[in-house]
């Protein structure tokens, strides 16, 4: 990854070879990035390192040389991912998906108006109005959804940290603070506890340095860093520090071996931004829906075009009819309805701590069938907590809950007093200042995670650790190092004025080796074989729980030999460190969050497979997986079965094990077929010790199985997987910027349980969108049939274009949106995730219900009203057939009705427009029933109840609007709507009732005979 690595990725070299095959090149680069990190700097000796980078290991680079390298390599910063320009985003909203249908409609309208204007003397302006309205609808809705997304991305931008990072470099022998962006390859850099590592470093000297690699590898434990080469894999060796990880304690010096995009972190970020993102399921649904609607529209249009030519219309009139029918089929209000429904759900999710970045992701979460979750910080609290102690030869359980409501143990034993004193004194962690009023478990600490856990545990059970330290002042200490694996300090004893106590903690087996006695019930007894076995059992048991175990021992130094003021020498040890007294063990774990087990259970009953993918140890990963229920009670892995039957693992049939823990190093050597085999045959899977590249491979594996995959994660290492998944979920509090950019949704409270709420909302909106669409499409039939009869039977036009718009954009809007607030019919979280291949948003059954059944009854209601009004005015239905040409003839002012009365053109038109208004009112009346039956797809409306207040408001609103349009003075001029006799409103009532009864009977049959032909034909 050093100087030579820059050339591996030079795109220029590859493009020349494939003759500009951009796509191939991109795939090649992605495969490059998917490979594990390749570098050899960690294997070089210090002299070789100095030669390779032409740098003096004590004085650093010269200023001039640093300038040259900076000019050559560019600044040490990650290239920001290519963002979509705002105007492109806006155009996507304006011309994407559903809007295209409306645009085509608008263009056809202008076309028809153009034809009419050219051919007729006094063309009607209907088509012009219609075109303008359609265009306006698209533009307004487009602006609305653009505004919604812009709002989410505003919140996103506020996450970015604006503080420029500083780095401490040595150049020409002088230490200097520079901006981290100016660090170059070969620079000599110093880091200390609390710093962010400014670039990839090869360590050349260190003092107790530990780094937190969790954002890169997912290990929650701080890792020691020292100059020794300890591992072939650069990610595991101790002598490399990675860009943007944090140094937790100690100090180190290192040589920069890679900067910016060439760092390990940079490669992962590049990998994430280079991934092709698939379309969201809802986008595909809407596309499928548009194809269906367009199919119906074109079929109707063309068949009536041919029919009108046969009936002897001129081809021009036939074209106008064709356009009219296609436009009448376009549900103008639906685009707005879908957008508003998704927005409402997004807002509801934001209140429940899920921030959705793009509206379409709302539904994706509902169709999720696999969740790949990160462990650290998502399933767990991301803070080490003391879980168990072993003293007086028994294991005691500590309280690991978030709100301190869990187990307590007997604190009266003198051994516990001794153990808590060692844990408090032999400990360098401290609480940061000014947090007195915050609960202990929530306080920030300075120091190593394990020590902080001990500090909090002792503070909670024994009171102030600071006072304990003040009463027992420290006189000497040896900090923890990796060779002797212990930490030791000597304190003046508060309980005897002359003497000192030596306290020590460290790796349990190392501590036990230094002890000759053990403290039981406050008395020292010799450490015999029996006690050693007891220790061994306790150590194995706690280790097997995936916990990190520390041993504690002490020695009361005799005051005769070591009086107060004695100079302890920690280099030439002038005090005993053997024959100590063993006191006990304490073990720590990063405990699961309180709400997670419940959430995992809900996922399981919802048919969602939860897979844990973590960089942590297999044992810890398995322990947490069992703790949160990802591996459920009684399910065994191959290893468990082998241990139970006492046979080697190779003899167990892997198919017998439901659960499975896969190690990253095994995953590395697997073919995709083997991975598919694992994903297929095991229901409960944990991947441990995985690298970021492997996360990506796992996600792709799940997608090959046809799953819709959600991935949660917070580290930079999760970003490629977040981007590749169908929906990426990042953590709002602990998440890194890179992961938030790659994600589609952000959990503001970092809680896995919020995902379950998201799934529920996503499933609900899918159901409710179906209902909304069914409701909206139904009124299409009573809008189209008048036009068809006008062509075939030559009757006066029963319903005008303007009135159609009043229905689609006026009365139908609020009721359609109100269905988004409808409560779930059954327990949504008990059914399997929908299959995107078979379970579509709009299917043939929905179309047949809306168009073929309910829509037809509605049309009958409208025509009934139309014929009643004309008959009351003297035109009986028999007289109307074939009257159209005379009726629309301006020069004909003496048209006779069935009773011989003569009608002028103006009088006829008033009656015609009154009919339009009445037809419109009838549609409103039958849409009442349609709205109520659309509340449920299977249950009876009486089971569901009328709890949806918005829906009741919608019913009242559409009625009030219809009445207003009919009776408001001046409407006759503006929209050609005329006042109606009260009785005419009631003509459609029987049809409304018929719709309600028809559908209730249908749903009754559905419930009585599940899977019968009624369900096959009508259950949408």
Swiss-Prot record:
UniProt KW Metal-binding keyword: yes
Keyword terms of this UniProt record: ATP-binding, Cell membrane, Ion transport, Magnesium, Membrane, Metal-binding, Nucleotide-binding, Phosphoprotein, Potassium, Potassium transport, Sodium, Sodium transport, Sodium/potassium transport, Translocase, Transmembrane, Transmembrane helix, Transport
Residues annotated with Phosphothreonine modification: 570
Catalyzed chemical reaction(s): K(+)(out) + Na(+)(in) + ATP + H2O = K(+)(in) + Na(+)(out) + ADP + phosphate + H(+)
Pfam families hit by this protein: Cation_ATPase, Cation_ATPase_C, Cation_ATPase_N, E1-E2_ATPase, Hydrolase
Subcellular location: Membrane; Cell membrane
Region (Disordered): 1-31, 212-231
GO terms of molecular function: ATP binding; ATP hydrolysis activity; P-type sodium:potassium-exchanging transporter activity; potassium ion binding; protein-folding chaperone binding; sodium ion binding; steroid hormone binding
InterPro entries to which the protein is assigned, alphabetical: ATPase_P-typ_cation-transptr_C, ATPase_P-typ_cation-transptr_N, ATPase_P-typ_cyto_dom_N, ATPase_P-typ_P_site, ATPase_P-typ_TM_dom_sf, ATPase_P-typ_transduc_dom_A_sf, Cation_transp_ATPase_P-type, HAD-like_sf
Modified residues (Phosphoserine): 10, 439, 450, 496, 559, 587, 672, 826, 940
Topology in membrane: Multi-pass membrane protein
GO cellular component, one term: plasma membrane
Entries under CDD domains matching the protein: P-type_ATPase_Na-K_like
PANTHER family in UniProt: SODIUM/POTASSIUM-TRANSPORTING ATPASE SUBUNIT ALPHA (PTHR43294), SODIUM_POTASSIUM-TRANSPORTING ATPASE SUBUNIT ALPHA-2 (PTHR43294:SF6)
Family (UniProt): Belongs to the cation transport ATPase (P-type) (TC 3.A.3) family. Type IIC subfamily.
Oligomeric form and interacting partners: The sodium/potassium-transporting ATPase is composed of a catalytic alpha subunit, an auxiliary non-catalytic beta subunit and an additional regulatory subunit. Interacts with regulatory subunit FXYD1.
Protein's name according to its UniProt entry: Sodium/potassium-transporting ATPase subunit alpha-2
Gene (name only): ATP1A2
């Amino acid at each position: 990854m050093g100087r030579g690595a820059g050339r591996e990725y030079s795109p220029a070299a590859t493009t020349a070879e494939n003759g500009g095959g951009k796509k191939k090149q991109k795939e090649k680069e992605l495969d490059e990035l998917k490979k594990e990190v390749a570098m050899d700097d960690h294997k070089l000796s210090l002299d070789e390192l100095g030669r390779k980078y032409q740098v003096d290991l004590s004085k650093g680079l010269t200023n001039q040389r640093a300038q040259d390298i900076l000019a050559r390599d560019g600044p040490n910063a990650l290239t920001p991912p290519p963002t979509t320009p705002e105007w492109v985003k806006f155009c996507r909203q304006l011309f994407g998906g559903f809007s295209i249908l409306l645009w085509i409609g608008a263009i056809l309208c202008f076309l028809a108006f153009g034809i009419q204007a050219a051919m007729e003397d006094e063309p009607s302006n209907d088509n012009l109005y219609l075109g303008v309205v359609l265009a306006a609808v698209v533009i307004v809705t487009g602006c609305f959804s653009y505004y919604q997304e812009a709002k989410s991305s505003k919140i996103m931008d506020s996450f970015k940290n604006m503080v420029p990072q500083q780095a401490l470099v040595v150049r020409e022998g002088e230490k200097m603070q520079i901006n981290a962006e100016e660090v170059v390859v070969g620079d000599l850099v110093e880091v200390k506890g609390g710093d962010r590592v400014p670039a990839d470093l090869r360590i050349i000297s260190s003092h107790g340095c530990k780094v937190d690699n969790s954002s890169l590898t997912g290990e929650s434990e701080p890792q020691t860093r020292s100059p020794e080469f300890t591992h072939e894999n650069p990610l595991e060796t101790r002598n490399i520090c990675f860009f943007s990880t944090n140094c937790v304690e100690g100090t180190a010096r290192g040589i920069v071996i890679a900067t910016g995009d060439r760092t390990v972190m940079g490669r992962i970020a590049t990998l994430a931004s280079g991934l092709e993102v698939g379309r969201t399921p809802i986008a595909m649904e809407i596309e499928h829906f548009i194809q269906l609607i367009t199919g119906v529209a074109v079929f109707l249009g063309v068949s009536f075009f041919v029919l009108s030519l046969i009936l002897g219309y001129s081809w021009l009139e036939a074209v106008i009819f064709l356009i009219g029918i296609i436009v009448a089929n376009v549900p103008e209000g639906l685009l707005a309805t879908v957008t508003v429904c998704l927005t409402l759900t997004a807002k509801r999710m934001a209140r429940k701590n899920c921030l959705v970045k793009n509206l379409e992701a709302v539904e994706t979460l509902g169709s999720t069938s696999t969740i790949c979750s990160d462990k650290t910080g998502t399933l767990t609290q991301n803070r080490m907590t003391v879980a168990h102690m072993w003293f007086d030869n028994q294991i005691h359980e500590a309280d690991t809950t978030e709100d301190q409501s869990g187990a307590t143990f007997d604190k009266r034993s003198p051994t516990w007093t001794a153990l808590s004193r060692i844990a408090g004194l032999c400990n360098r962690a401290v609480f940061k200042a000014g947090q007195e009023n915050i609960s202990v478990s929530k306080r920030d600490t300075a120091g190593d995670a394990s020590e902080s856990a001990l500090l909090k545990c002792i503070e909670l059970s024994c009171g102030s650790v600071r006072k304990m330290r003040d009463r027992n002042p420290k006189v000497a200490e040896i900090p923890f190092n990796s060779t002797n694996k212990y930490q030791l300090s000597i304190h003046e004893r508060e309980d005897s004025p002359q003497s000192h106590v030596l306290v020590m903690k460290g790796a349990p087996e190392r501590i036990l080796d230094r002890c000759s006695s053990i403290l039981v019930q406050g008395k020292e007894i010799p450490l015999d074989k029996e006690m050693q076995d007891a220790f061994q059992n306790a150590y194995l048991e706690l280790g097997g729980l995936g916990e990190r175990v520390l041993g504690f021992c002490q020695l009361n130094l005799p005051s005769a030999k070591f009086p107060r003021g004695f100079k302890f020498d920690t280099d030439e040890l002038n005090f005993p460190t053997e024959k100590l007294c063993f006191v006990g063990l304490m073990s720590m774990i990063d405990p699961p969050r309180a709400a997670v087990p419940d959430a995992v259970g809900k996922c399981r009953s919802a048919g969602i497979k939860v897979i844990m993918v973590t960089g942590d140890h297999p044992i810890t990963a398995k322990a947490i997986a069992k703790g949160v229920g990802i591996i459920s009670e009684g399910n065994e892995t191959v290893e468990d079965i082998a241990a139970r039957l006492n046979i080697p693992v190779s003899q167990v049939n892997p198919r017998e094990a439901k659960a499975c823990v896969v190690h990253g190093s095994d995953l590395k050597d697997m073919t995709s077929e083997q991975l598919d085999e694992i994903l297929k045959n095991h229901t409960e899977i944990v991947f441990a010790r995985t690298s970021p590249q492997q996360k990506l491979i796992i996600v792709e594996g799940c997608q090959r199985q046809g799953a819709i995959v959600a991935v949660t994660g917070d580290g930079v290492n999760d970003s490629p997987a977040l981007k590749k998944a169908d929906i990426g979920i990042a953590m709002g509090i602990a998440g890194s910027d890179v992961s938030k950019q790659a994600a589609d949704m952000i959990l503001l409270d970092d809680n896995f349980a919020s995902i379950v709420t998201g799934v529920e909302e996503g499933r609900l909106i899918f159901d409710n969108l179906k209902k909304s669409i069914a409701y909206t499409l139904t009124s299409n039939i009573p809008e189209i049939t008048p036009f068809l009869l006008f062509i075939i039977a030559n009757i006066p036009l029963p319903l005008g274009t303007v009135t159609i718009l009043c229905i689609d954009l006026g009365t139908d809007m609020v009721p359609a949106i109100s269905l988004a607030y409808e409560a779930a019919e059954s327990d949504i979280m008990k059914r399997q995730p929908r299959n995107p291949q078979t379970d579509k948003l709009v299917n043939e059954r929905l179309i047949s219900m809306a168009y073929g059944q309910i829509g037809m009854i509605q049309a009958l209601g409208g025509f009934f009203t139309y014929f009643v009004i004309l008959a009351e005015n003297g035109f009986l239905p028999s007289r109307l057939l074939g009257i159209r040409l005379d009726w629309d003839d301006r020069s004909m002012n003496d048209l006779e009705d069935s009773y011989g009365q003569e009608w002028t053109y103006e009088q006829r038109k008033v009656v015609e427009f009154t009919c339009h208004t009445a037809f419109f009112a009838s549609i409103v009346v039958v849409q009442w029933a349609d709205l109520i039956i659309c509340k449920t797809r299977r249950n009876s409306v009486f089971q569901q109840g009328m709890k949806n207040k918005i829906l009741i408001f919608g019913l009242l609103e559409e009625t009030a609007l219809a009445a207003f349009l009919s009776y408001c003075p001046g409407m006759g001029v503006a929209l050609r709507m005329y006042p109606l006799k009260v009785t005419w409103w009631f003509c459609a009532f029987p049809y409304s009732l018929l719709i309600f009864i028809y559908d209730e009977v249908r749903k009754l049959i559905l419930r009585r005979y599940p899977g019968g032909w009624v369900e096959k034909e009508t259950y949408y």
